[in-house]
From Swiss-Prot:
Gene3D superfamilies: 3.40.91.30
Name of protein: Head completion nuclease
Effect of E29C: Reduced nuclease activity
HAMAP family assigned: NUCL_HEAD_T4
Amino acid sequence: MAYSGKWVPKNISKYRGDPKKITYRSNWEKFFFEWLDKNPEIIAWGSETAVIPYFCNAEGKKRRYFMDIWMKDSSGQEFFIEIKPKKETQPPVKPAHLTTAAKKRFMNEIYTWSVNTDKWKAAQSLAEKRGIKFRILTEDGLRALGFKGA
């Protein structure tokens, strides 16, 4: 079961969107929300406020990508931030032994990788057009910001 819940910012004036409707979908997102809220260098941010249309090749149809975070720092630079496990930011590795379970897991990983890369290409393209920087934040980056959890 995924770790999720509602979250309320202390610095409501920094949040763009409805502060009563903020949902974290992982303990990593919750940590990053708290970091954004406390960090004086972040002047504005929102959770799932940027919606990016993309074509999902795995499903053969148009979809909408709800970016995890939009933020603006004190220099005025805007960022799209996607929070993902490092494992999902790299192409899957074919298992050495192709058991039924390993094949199924590998196929799921290929599907996830395909969907993610389609989303990230669309996000990067839109970001470049708007002068926004697109970043994928993994557990390594979160630890560098002070995350202590698993």
